[in-house]
Amino acid sequence: MLHVAHLVETIIVVVAGAAIFGSPSRLHGPLLYDDKAAVQRNPLVSGATPLHRVWDLDFWGEHELSSAESHKSFRPLVTLTYRANYLLHGHDSWGYHAVNVVLHTLNCALVPPTVRAAFGWRDPDELQLVPVAAALLFALHPVHVEAVQQIVGRAELLMALFFLLGFLGNAPPALEPCARTRAPDPSPSPNPD
């Protein structure tokens, strides 16, 4: 069960992330650079190529992975999320940006528990500023901002999401608050005999 302090800090980070990256000007920004090739001109996204071909074609949906023309970029999960976006919003960039903002906000919310887990901070009342500061730094770092702005950055956003979830999945005790315990006394106890 999450402690109230953990919930509050997570809410702060989620709100900050949504406020920073969810502004209308960012959500309605155009598709840029590689976004056009990955989304607008990708036959896997538009449905011109059958969806089961996502396992055979490169990220751009143009070449067989085994062909010499392919650059061997293979991101089927990302392509499937673009296809879902296309089914809901067509080529309107708003939906693609909104998904990236949601993914980034989820990642920001996962940073505080990841920091606590990484450093073994299990007491919910100690060091609350460090996980929040780490999450805000994560939210504002230019590498992550670029990944949110450009639709092709979804690959990085999904990678971060699955990494953070995987890390937390392997560190479950750090997510549960527990009472601070004292280490056992290493000195031998006196023998009553």
Give the positions of each predicted feature.
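Polytopic membrane enzymes that build or remodel cell-surface glycoconjugates and lipids
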Residues: 1-193
